[in-house]
Amino acid sequence: MGATTVELTEANFEDTLKKGGILLIDFWAAWCGPCRAFAPTFEAAAGKHTDITFAKVDTEKEKGLAAAFEIRSIPTLAVFRDGIMLGQNAGALPADALEKKIQQIRDIDMEKVKDEVAARAKQAKQV
């Protein structure tokens, strides 16, 4: 793992998430060929986008996190912004697709997303 990525564990997950901003998590395992193929792409993006937190979760060591995210195939990329999970992508993304994904995340109107989350929470309390 390069200096530009964070190794996520159950112990540091909440603190990492609370930092806010964009968080990209690569769920991987050492035995996974596609994971090993995606690793240099993920590391290169981490070096290029220093304002984003890039993190990796070894699904063999962190089975609790993998279960919490219902990881069924690896690699899987989980995307957060300002502490809100925006989605997951299963499979190794090519560099251009990862760059496109990062731009899409940057372009999201988070005030609108936060309003939608608050409305759903309010609606859930009424049920």
Question: What are the language-model segments listed below?
Answer:
Residues 1-53, 60-127:
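Proteins that catalyze or organize thiol-disulfide redox chemistry
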